Amino acid sequence: MPCFELLLQHLHSHPQRLHQLHAVLITTGFHLPSPPRGLLPIRQGSSAAFFYNCLIRACLRHRDRPDTSLRLFAQMLAHGVRPNRHTFPSLLKAAAAAPSPSSGRAIHAQAVRRGLLLDDFTNCSLVDFYARVGDLGSARKTFDELPQPDLASRNSMLHALCVHGDLASALALFESMVDGNAISWTSLINGYARNGDFHEAIVLFRRWIMQKDVPSRPNEAMLVSVLSACANLDHHRALSRGLEIHGFIVRNEAPLTAFLGTALIDMYSKHGHLGYCTDVFQATREKGVVCTWNAMISALARNGRAASALHLFDAMTTSGLRPNHVTFVVVLTACAMQKLVDEGLRWFESMSTEFGVVPLMEHYGCVVDLLGRAGFLKEAFDFIGRMPFEADASVWGALLGACKVHENVQFGDGVGKQLIELKPWHAGLYMVLRNIYAGAGRWDDAARMKKALQNSGMKKPTGYSWIVSGNCV
């Protein structure tokens, strides 16, 4: 294999070296379709395209460089290098990460011009691109124009339908796939789970394991999805289903990866079984992955063990693991539950100064919740005013909840008006405001909120409960 080809394969993860190699390619002329002879032995024809394809893929691996990949493609065309079936998949991924989808449409046009629309790689990438940029119509059109879509193309379309919540169409496509594989099942199960139909996700998983040709080792992504469904299903049998899946994992000797351990900890914690959480955490903590620590810290905080959660966070940082955005959401939530205002504010400040984590909207919302729970409503209001960006409804909602708890109608009035401007269609908001006004004896205002809710056409979410007697609900 030529020297440059070897270098390109080995320098994927070193952007500075790649730029240097790119400069060498340009100065020596080896990026051209017909490079100069006598310098290095090189295959003619496809070699220049190979170089560009490698450079495009390497830049794509660095998510902050989609524009570099697109510029390389423009340079490739300018120098008369003909793109091939391996060029377009990487380009379309870069286009999906770009600010505007227009570059992806231009790449689509280039694929048409090059006669690559019937190529499996290119077609799957086009469907995936349109799904990523939210254009399900174009994804469908691209798929429907295939004379004989293969399994990979159908899996791409199935994934696109699931991502955009069109589960009826996804199920219809899935049922028509006589050659569906684990990827097909995973897409559908994940689609139902992420769209809130947790029961159906579990039913589909049970249907999958009943097949005769079920793979000997389960798919990790599928297991994570179905465990997420068990975690979020509000049903008395959800825990037993989760235990069954855990047993399935053990019986099939599936490796307990960090992601799978995180899903198990989350599932057990949401059903109040901290003992199981601890067992799974102990089995995965040595892997040195932040997500399992985050899950265990969250499990402790969620189950009223906020002090233990903060101790575990200390142990995490002492062990050398660097916390991420999720870690600080969990830690700030634990501080809020314990009303540890000073400690929570200290951790919030240390996010950027000590750990290099830039606070996001979620973190600001956690601080507002921290101050609000402790009764510092004015401080919470002032804190919102100092935010570097406009507070969204989740931040104002945290303050409104605190106003309700502390029966502070003065702040609740102003915060409520702010929230109505942001989310005028949210029925729960009107109900909270009505309760705040009623608690303060402002019956006219309470009636006004009730009337506004009725006139808007929104409906109060219906409450429900069940009683379990034996095996009956």
Question: Where are these predicted regions, by residue range?
Answer:
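Terminal (and in a subset, N-terminal) low-complexity or junction segments at the ends
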Residues: 1-150, 159-181, 187-473
